Amino acid sequence: MRRLRRILAQVLALMMAFAMPAAAEEQNMDARVDEVFRASNAVGGAFVVAQHGSIVYERYYGIQQKTTRVPVSEDTYFRCASVTKLVTGIGLMKMMDEGILDPDEDISTYLGYTVRNPSFMDTPITLRMLMSHTAGLVENSSFASQVSILSDMIDVKKKAGSNFKTDVKPGSEYAYSNFGAGITGAIIESVTGMDVSSYMRKTLFDPLGIDAAYSAAQLAHPENIAAVYNKDGSLYLAPSYMLRQQYTQEARPDYHYRVTIGRLLIRPRDLARLGIAICGDGTVDGVRVISGEAVAAMRREHSEETDGITADSPYTFFTIRQDTLFEGLRVYGHQGTDEGIVCNLYVEPENELVIVVMTNGCNTKRDDGIMRITRRLAAIAEDVYIKGNVE
């Protein structure tokens, strides 16, 4: 009996010997991550890392909103600004897999009216152009207005030329376009007969057990919505305002085009799970999200021969190719910012690494195009999960 106790004690000591360094390593990483959030004046934030198909690290910092002082947690929904485009892009790729959409079809076919740059009437505008930001749209047009009607702005019969660059042939020039991303949402509604948020929930989010929405009112736990703050820490959007934002759960492509620009609300772990899908073969937790061919297409550069796009765009299907985040490695993903929001989702396929950075307000300084806070957090992930430097 004494011998058995002695053996059990030795086993327990051995287990503790392994566990203690691991715990110490995680505490050290927590401290490093917290320091980045602190130095960036973040009100609240989240950093999630996944590798080899599983979430391996997550850290939540600060508060959801200053009035309630509720801490940020894995249950917090963040508004993810332009990362909305990448998530919408995954939904669009799924529709392409299913044969509902063709990336090279004239979008007029889907919208039910003729969309043309009046200076290039023989050149159709395609979904591929919209998703690579090469459609030649004017970004400072009336699309930003809450009452603008989409068809009034792009239907050639309504003399909508002011919303196009009249000296730029569609497909020939890269120019980042929020408006173009909005049009893709209108296409989803026109084709499916459903509002874009409900369609994405039904076809993409629900099968994965993800609670996310383009309308705050559709979320299961709206009490967990993070406020949005300006760079200086002042309030920009309260959760109560987001819940009151006008949104009708029926197809209204002439109006709902605004939501796919940047209104998605999602929890950090769920965004990381979508990242796992596009980092690998299109599956997550055994569920097929998109085909492996679709994942490959999101990473491939366009060419004139295969796609009819002559522009040198860093985006393919709302996915940017980025070569400066990790040393000697290419990552794919998207960045989002709106006032003080920072949201980044990047995947690095060689090491099967996914990183998610989300804040509800912080310093939005950039280094070589990428948010400084994201570069600093990515450096920690690179150090630990790629280089294996654990202190």
Which positions does each model-derived feature cover?
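Short, gly/Ser/Thr-rich active-site loops of penicillin-recognizing serine hydrolases
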Residues: 361-391
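Short, well-ordered beta-strand elements
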Residues: 342-361
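Short active-site loop at a secondary-structure junction
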Residues: 38-46, 68-129, 166-179, 259-262, ...
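Short, surface-exposed loop or secondary-structure junction motifs
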Residues: 65, 119-337
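Bacterial N-terminal signal peptides
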Residues: 11-19
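Short, conserved catalytic-motif segment at the N-terminal edge
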Residues: 26-78, 100, 158-164
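Sec-dependent signal peptide cleavage junction
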Residues: 20-25
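Bacterial N-terminal signal peptides that target proteins for export
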Residues: 1-11
